[in-house]
Amino acid sequence: MSASPLDQFKILTIFKLPNIAGYNIDFTNASLFMVLSTISVALFCYIGLKKESIIPNGIQSIVEFIYEFIVSTIESNVGKEGLQYIPLVFTIFMFIATCNLLGILPLGFTATSHIAVTFAISMVVFVSVTIIGFKHQGIHFLRILLPQGTPGWLAPMMVFIELFAYCARPVSLSIRLAANMIAGHTIIKVIAGFVVKMNIFLTPLPMIFIIILIGFEIFVAILQAYIFTVLTCVYLSDAVKEH
């Protein structure tokens, strides 16, 4: 029986750990690839910035390009006052992009295809933005729940709707990212399996098509990290700027 395209998303235990308060904390393939993503990002930045030079080398150029891209994204969505949160936004972008890209490699696993992982990342953003909002605006941050010009009789309903929308942010962020990663990797698996079954793997046209598809998936992996980053900056804008 042929393997399902969804088998690539199965959580597999690598080694067991004692339960904590009844919760299973076994080290899984998802844990492994999140650790690999973290190490990869740290090494990439360390190697790129270890020997800074006026004329940057290849890795330094990439690190500086990503940094400048993050700065530009923050400035365009939050403003100069948002630049103090570059470490947060940079880390989120790099971690998600690396997790997405590692899943494309042979024998790789896409940690961001699981809602538990993407929801955890989204909650980091949600909690951080909420804390930053109260830090910058104090109690006035709650104005985000009541749009200006709202009639008094409509205020209770609007507060309820806006509160629901605000609390739904991490849910929408996590579902969007996980769903896109599942869809992209599943399509590649299905088409690759079809090519192998038809015994046309070595013919030029299917090979070219698969290469193009993988290239597109790399683009989508980076694009999803970018979209998540932009939405994070939009939420930061709500927290930093008074309404």
Swiss-Prot record:
It is a multi-pass membrane protein. Its main location: membrane. The chain crosses the membrane at residues 29-49, 54-74, 89-109, 114-134, 144-164, 182-202, 208-228. It is found in: Cell inner membrane. GO terms for cellular component: plasma membrane; proton-transporting ATP synthase complex. InterPro entries: ATP_synth_F0_asu (IPR000568), ATP_synth_F0_asu_AS (IPR023011), ATP_synth_F0_asu_bact/mt (IPR045083), F0_ATP_A_sf (IPR035908). GO terms for molecular function: proton-transporting ATP synthase activity, rotational mechanism. Keywords: ATP synthesis, Cell inner membrane, Cell membrane, CF(0), Hydrogen ion transport, Ion transport, Membrane, Transmembrane, Transmembrane helix, Transport. Pfam families: ATP-synt_A. Belongs to the ATPase A chain family. NCBIfam families: ATP_synt_6_or_A, PRK05815.2-4. F-type ATPases have 2 components, CF(1) - the catalytic core - and CF(0) - the membrane proton channel. CF(1) has five subunits: alpha(3), beta(3), gamma(1), delta(1), epsilon(1). CF(0) has three main subunits: a(1), b(2) and c(9-12). The alpha and beta chains form an alternating ring which encloses part of the gamma chain. CF(1) is attached to CF(0) by a central stalk formed by the gamma and epsilon chains, while a peripheral stalk is formed by the delta and b chains. PANTHER family: ATP SYNTHASE SUBUNIT A. Key component of the proton channel; it plays a direct role in the translocation of protons across the membrane. This is ATP synthase subunit a. It comes from Ehrlichia canis (strain Jake).
